[in-house]
């Protein structure tokens, strides 16, 4: 068992403590726990009803003390541990809760059908009452209103002990009141009254409310069952992500033997073996072997990536072929995989401003409903209605009110969206991104590592004079690569990579800031700046001169290759644009967004890249702090700015923007600075991430409109006597079901 996220040391510093809170049944419960915690000096708490997690920033308090405060409020709490994140592949509390509810629901539904039929018959047609009819109805109703409804009664009793109320209080009081009134009517001395029409069984004939008590139980259980099942589905994406982690790992011993141990016991710098079909157990560096690695489950990237010795690999990915010996560089909770799982869970436990308002309303909702129900019943009595009619109205108000929908409106949408985003390689860190996204009008891109692959490559080879054959081209590239193979310059690596098999070099000489030279296969070869290569013999070849001018106008680097004193070729070296760059920029512009490029390159290079990918404007010669200044100036002009970068030298810009998107594998700076992490190194995920955020906000707004609108409309209708309690109970259950089901539509986001 892992230790709690926050220890007990250094109590005087502000520490973030996370607690699992059990026993909350509605948003009012979450609001009550949050209020209790926030009353403590030095404590700032946020309680999420959907995830049952309390996030607390506390000074001078240990986790045990905070758990005690929650216990006094009538709920159970325990420190949230890292294992509750990483072991989600085996833990599905909502699924288990749904199964428990289903058992009660099935029994209640089976008994409710004959109970409803007989209650209606006996109420409408008293002459149909057989001897012992009251005992028959009581026998059918008793298991439903006691055992099946016990989850509501138990919470209501616990609330009563702590002098609080919740949604369960409304339900339990409604069930108990309907049952007591019915038993009094059935076994009392009231003479039977004939009625006509099914509604008279509820409104004006004998007051047999047993089917109402049982019906409310059935409908609410059904609503809670579907709600729990839907929340289980909402968390399935996170469990699927956690499932990617390896369960066991084969550790390589010093004598070459292998020892299989649980992956949780793997230590940093230990070497382990991964074979085809196996999951890499930790982040690490390949020591031996070569293999294609399937990154799709982690990043959504369909194309396998080939790993060689010295290559970095990510835990949670799968080896497709070959055998790899890997040295672990990060294990357990320190891996990139674990960090991404934490990002998803943390996003699910945060609250939006709208949700805080909803929770505040839910906190006072239940007492207000009791007052409204009492006033409605009293008003009907004062107006001359009978006690039966007044009771029916009071009961209808009690059972139709539903703060649950308010509490579920935002977190269920966020749970589904963050889970779906994880499947697509998009990690939304919190509600800041969602609340900002709708006003974004400008997207700023870093160049190196964001629009480009971040690696220099030979983009063009221009031959001099008549040497235009493929054989001549390969020969010159081979000679240049042979000389450059002895150099450590970044451009040298690009030239070497362009030739499949460079030969050996002798007499290598490097001239700082100019170029290199050496003897290759009996030829004297020089590679370097055009001005250095032509220092003794000017080059007048039209093709080479044109290639030089064109390359330099685009901001690319041009080098000449001289063989035995004759300039043979011009090589253009540039950072290659990503294949997805132009399509991603076009997608953003089609959404009405302005695009800007920020780069440290010169003006020519910046304009060339902007033109190639279709960016509206470019700002050149930027230092990292200069990027922050540009973003700040845009914001002062009234623009809402999103910054897309790789987190390597643009961390401050990611923080300074209204919305930061870090693309690529994600450095520690990026994980801390960005609002959205795009794990897949594909720029098409930028518009996709913005679309997902917008879709999530639309869903949240729809949920909130429904939740508020339902209660605003339903309670007055019930108080006016226009709904019988049975239909009121069904409507209350449906309100929560609608919110959760609407959120589940986000599971299909991005599906083709």
Swiss-Prot record:
<dbReference type="Pfam" id="PF00403">
    <property type="entry name" value="HMA"/>
</dbReference>
<dbReference type="GO" id="GO:0005829">
    <property type="term" value="C:cytosol"/>
</dbReference>
<keyword id="KW-0479">Metal-binding</keyword>
<dbReference type="InterPro" id="IPR006121">
    <property type="entry name" value="HMA_dom"/>
</dbReference>
<dbReference type="InterPro" id="IPR000579">
    <property type="entry name" value="Cation-trans_P-type_ATPase_A/B"/>
</dbReference>
<feature type="binding site">
    <location>
        <position position="29"/>
    </location>
    <ligand>
        <name>a metal cation</name>
    </ligand>
</feature>
<keyword id="KW-0472">Membrane</keyword>
<dbReference type="InterPro" id="IPR036163">
    <property type="entry name" value="HMA_dom_sf"/>
</dbReference>
<feature type="transmembrane region" description="Helical">
    <location>
        <begin position="132"/>
        <end position="152"/>
    </location>
</feature>
<dbReference type="InterPro" id="IPR018303">
    <property type="entry name" value="ATPase_P-typ_P_site"/>
</dbReference>
<dbReference type="GO" id="GO:0005886">
    <property type="term" value="C:plasma membrane"/>
</dbReference>
<dbReference type="GO" id="GO:0016887">
    <property type="term" value="F:ATP hydrolysis activity"/>
</dbReference>
<feature type="domain" description="HMA">
    <location>
        <begin position="15"/>
        <end position="78"/>
    </location>
</feature>
<dbReference type="GO" id="GO:0055070">
    <property type="term" value="P:copper ion homeostasis"/>
</dbReference>
<keyword id="KW-1133">Transmembrane helix</keyword>
<protein>
    <recommendedName>
        <fullName>Cation-transporting P-type ATPase B</fullName>
        <ecNumber>7.2.2.-</ecNumber>
    </recommendedName>
</protein>
<keyword id="KW-1003">Cell membrane</keyword>
<dbReference type="InterPro" id="IPR027256">
    <property type="entry name" value="P-typ_ATPase_IB"/>
</dbReference>
<dbReference type="InterPro" id="IPR036412">
    <property type="entry name" value="HAD-like_sf"/>
</dbReference>
<dbReference type="InterPro" id="IPR017969">
    <property type="entry name" value="Heavy-metal-associated_CS"/>
</dbReference>
<dbReference type="GO" id="GO:0005507">
    <property type="term" value="F:copper ion binding"/>
</dbReference>
<feature type="transmembrane region" description="Helical">
    <location>
        <begin position="491"/>
        <end position="511"/>
    </location>
</feature>
<dbReference type="GO" id="GO:0005524">
    <property type="term" value="F:ATP binding"/>
</dbReference>
<keyword id="KW-0547">Nucleotide-binding</keyword>
<feature type="transmembrane region" description="Helical">
    <location>
        <begin position="714"/>
        <end position="734"/>
    </location>
</feature>
<keyword id="KW-0067">ATP-binding</keyword>
<comment type="similarity">
    <text>Belongs to the cation transport ATPase (P-type) (TC 3.A.3) family. Type IB subfamily.</text>
</comment>
<feature type="transmembrane region" description="Helical">
    <location>
        <begin position="105"/>
        <end position="125"/>
    </location>
</feature>
<dbReference type="Pfam" id="PF00702">
    <property type="entry name" value="Hydrolase"/>
</dbReference>
<dbReference type="InterPro" id="IPR023214">
    <property type="entry name" value="HAD_sf"/>
</dbReference>
<feature type="transmembrane region" description="Helical">
    <location>
        <begin position="201"/>
        <end position="221"/>
    </location>
</feature>
<dbReference type="InterPro" id="IPR008250">
    <property type="entry name" value="ATPase_P-typ_transduc_dom_A_sf"/>
</dbReference>
<dbReference type="GO" id="GO:0016020">
    <property type="term" value="C:membrane"/>
</dbReference>
<feature type="transmembrane region" description="Helical">
    <location>
        <begin position="361"/>
        <end position="381"/>
    </location>
</feature>
<feature type="binding site">
    <location>
        <position position="26"/>
    </location>
    <ligand>
        <name>a metal cation</name>
    </ligand>
</feature>
<dbReference type="InterPro" id="IPR044492">
    <property type="entry name" value="P_typ_ATPase_HD_dom"/>
</dbReference>
<feature type="transmembrane region" description="Helical">
    <location>
        <begin position="390"/>
        <end position="410"/>
    </location>
</feature>
<dbReference type="InterPro" id="IPR001757">
    <property type="entry name" value="P_typ_ATPase"/>
</dbReference>
<dbReference type="GO" id="GO:0043682">
    <property type="term" value="F:P-type divalent copper transporter activity"/>
</dbReference>
<dbReference type="Pfam" id="PF00122">
    <property type="entry name" value="E1-E2_ATPase"/>
</dbReference>
<keyword id="KW-0812">Transmembrane</keyword>
<feature type="active site" description="4-aspartylphosphate intermediate">
    <location>
        <position position="446"/>
    </location>
</feature>
